[in-house]
Regions:
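Short, solvent-exposed beta-strand edge segments and adjacent coil->beta transition regions
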Residues: 2-6, 66-70
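Vicinal oxygen chelate
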Residues: 2-3, 33-35, 43-48, 59, ...
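Core segments of cupin and vicinal oxygen chelate
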Residues: 8-52
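Short hydrophobic/aromatic beta-strand micro-patches
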Residues: 10, 72-74
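Glycine-centered flexibility motif
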Residues: 13, 66-68, 108
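Solvent-exposed, flexible loop/coil residues
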Residues: 15, 73, 107
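A short alpha-helix capping/helix-coil boundary motif
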Residues: 23, 62-65
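Contiguous beta-strand/loop segments that form the cofactor/metal-binding neighborhood of enzyme cores
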Residues: 54-56
Length: 136
């Protein structure tokens, strides 16, 4: 049985800023947002761009953090990966620069301003790393 996984990101008062950031970086649209009466706290937000979805909200107490969380996004074209990489690196920190990885295919890691690490990947079927290097 296939399952879809939707990342749920929890913030300590930064969810409003994260919504705007992810809308711009990933060309996402707001499917649903529930906020407090003052408009300061996000109780629930659901963003989508047709390829993947994000849910996010603010927690009143400091959110629990995992020891390590990476969100791997697999792209259908190198151009699409490069566009998202450029938008992420505008305000984010490059952890692994975009390059052909030893394991084949294009790969990068960027930590966004909210501390979320995005791993970006693209691979052409049947192509080895050496063949991908010819595209540079």
């Amino acid at each position: 049985m296939p399952y879809a996984a939707t990342p749920c990101l929890v913030f300590a008062g930064q969810a409003k800023q994260a919504i705007v950031y992810y809308e711009n970086v990933f060309a996402m649209t707001r499917r649903r947002i529930i906020m407090d009466e003052a408009g300061d706290t996000v109780y629930h937000a659901h963003l989508s761009n047709g390829a993947f979805e994000l849910m996010l909200w603010d927690e009143s107490a400091a959110p629990n953090t995992s020891s390590s969380l990476h969100l791997l996004l697999t792209f259908t074209s190198l151009e699409e990966l490069e566009q998202v990489y450029l938008r992420l690196t505008t305000d984010g920190q490059i952890v692994t620069p975009l390059a052909v990885a030893d394991f084949g295919g294009w790969y990068a890691q960027v930590r966004d301003p909210f501390g979320i690490l995005f791993a970006l990947s693209f691979s052409e079927e049947g192509r080895e790393s050496e063949a991908l290097l010819e595209r540079e």
